[in-house]
Each structure stands twice: as C-alpha cells, then as structure tokens.
Regions:
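Conserved small/polar residues in nucleotide/adenosyl-binding loops
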Residues: 125-132, 136
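Short helix-capping/hinge motifs at transmembrane helix termini and TM-loop junctions
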Residues: 15, 29, 73, 77-78, ...
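Cytosolic, membrane-interface loops and tails of multi-pass inner-membrane proteins
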Residues: 23-53, 105
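Membrane-interfacial loop-to-helix junctions in multi-pass transporters
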Residues: 2, 80-86, 121
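Alpha-helical transmembrane segments in multi-pass membrane proteins
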Residues: 4, 8, 12, 17, ...
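Membrane-interface alpha-helices at helix entry/exit sites of multi-pass transporters
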Residues: 42-45, 49-59, 85, 120-124
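Transmembrane helix interruption/hinge and helix-loop junction motifs
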Residues: 78-80, 118-127
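C-terminal ends of transmembrane helices
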Residues: 21-24, 94-104, 133
Length: 136
C-alpha cells in the first residue's frame, strides 16, 4: 500500500477538523455557535449570530484551511496532483464531520473554495470575476 494516500487523507482531514466558527464563538462571545441561529458550525451562521465582521473572519479562516491542506500536500508530494485532491476533499469532509464535535460541522463551502483556489487559483479568479461582472 502506498502510504502517501493515507498521509494526504489524514492531514487533510485534520486540517478540516479545525472549526473556526466554533473557536471564534467561544473566544469572542463565549458561546457554542452550534446552539444558536441555524445551529450550523459555519461562516453563514456566525454571520447571522455574531455579525458580518466575524462571519468574514470565519470564512477567510475556512478558505485558508482548505488551501493549506492542498498546499501542504503539494509541498510533501510535488508534481503529484492526486494527493492534493485527496487532501482537499478530506479537508472538506473534516469540516463537515469533525470528530471532536461529534461529527457535526459546517457545510464545507468555504473549505471547498479554498481547495479550488489552491489547486488552480487562476481558473477560480476568472470564475469569480465573471460572476461579479454578471451581478453588476
């Protein structure tokens, strides 16, 4: 068995298990974000419960978490994109199903965006630009 797949999967999952929404809720308002609003441990619920500023902070941290999992895998296994994909997908799964929160996490959208940005940021930049132009 090639242990590189396992290493990528475990590191990606552990990156994903870091729940920024939970820690921001505890540190800033001393609340468990899963007990307020939509009861979802994600950036959208933080925005509803704690305000736009903290929602943006959580979203950025979740995006960075998805990107960091991919970047670490690309650093450990240069030129082997399959390990980066595995790390990114497992980071999303870790965000949705974190083991230390009884497998109740967020929806994984910001982590998915972070994974896409790390894998091919030029393509994502163009997509976001087109989306912004079509809205205004």
């Amino acid at each position: 068995m090639d242990y590189n797949y396992l290493i990528s999967a475990i590191t990606g999952y552990l990156f994903g298990c870091f729940q920024a929404s939970y820690f921001v809720g505890i540190l800033v308002n001393k609340i468990d974000i899963r007990e307020h609003g939509s009861t979802n441990a994600g950036a959208s619920n933080v925005t509803m419960v704690m305000g736009f500023k903290w929602g943006v902070v959580v979203a950025v941290l979740d995006i960075l978490k998805g990107s960091a999992a991919v970047w670490l895998s690309q650093f450990l296994f240069p030129g082997q994109i399959e390990f980066a994909f595995i790390a990114g997908i497992c980071a999303i799964l870790g965000h949705i199903y974190p083991f230390f929160m009884k497998f109740q996490g967020g929806k994984g959208i910001a982590t998915l965006i972070g994974m896409f940005l790390a894998l091919n940021w030029r393509s994502e930049e163009r997509r976001v630009g087109k989306e912004c132009r079509s809205r205004w």
